[in-house]
Amino acid sequence: LLKKVEQIFVEYIQSDDTSALEQKSLDIFWPVLEESALKAIPYRPTLDERPYESWSRDYHEDVVNIHINNVYKPDSPLSEKRPQFAAALIRLLEDTQELTPEVTKVACGSWLNSVPTFLEIFPDVWKASGQRSKNVRYTLGHWGQFMDRRGDFHARNGSRFREMGDFPYPSLHCTDSLEAVLCHLREKFPEPIVKRLQTKLRRIPLES
C-alpha cells in the first residue's frame, strides 16, 4: 500500500493542488480502513478492567503520570460525566498516596491541557507549568483531538488542522504536587457528591 501511495506522491509532488493526491491515496487505503472499521467492536470495559474509568497511570521516580481515554462514549468526561470523571481521578490519586507514599507529584502530557474545561479540574500551578511537547508521537496525547466523543473523526478539528498547519490544541506537559491537585479537586467537587460517586463506581460496571 505504501509503495502505491509513494508513487502517487511522486506523481503530484510539484502540484499546488493536493486534491487528486488525497483522493487517489484514500482510494488505496479505504478498502482496508472500511474492513477494519466494520469489524471493530466497541470497547466497554468494566471497573475491574479500568478501576479509574477514563484515567490510568504509571510511575517514574516520585511522579505519577496520568493518562486519559474516554470510556463514557458517547458522553463526554468534560460535560455529562464531569463529576464522575473527577471522582475517579480523586480515587486514583488517593490510592496512589496510600500505596506509593514516595510519589509526591502528578504529571500529564496531553492536548487536553490546552482545553479550558479540562484545565478547570486542576490548580493554577498546573496550568502555568504547561510545556509544549517537542516530539509528536502516535498517541492519544497528540492525536486524540481528532476523535469526537463518539469515537468518530472530529471533522472540525481536522479542518482546523489543515488550515493552521498545526495542532488546534497543542499537547502540553503539565505538573503539580499530588497534594495540591487533590486539595483543588476536593474543593471543586464537594465531598458528599464525590463520596456517593466513589461508592457507586466501586460496584457498577461502566456499561451499566
Regions found by a protein language model. Name each.
Residues 78-95:
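Well-ordered, non-membrane alpha-helical segments in soluble/globular domains
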Residues 85, 107-108:
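Charged, low-complexity surface patches
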Residues 108-114:
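An acidic- and aromatic-residue-enriched active-site/binding cleft used to recognize and process polar
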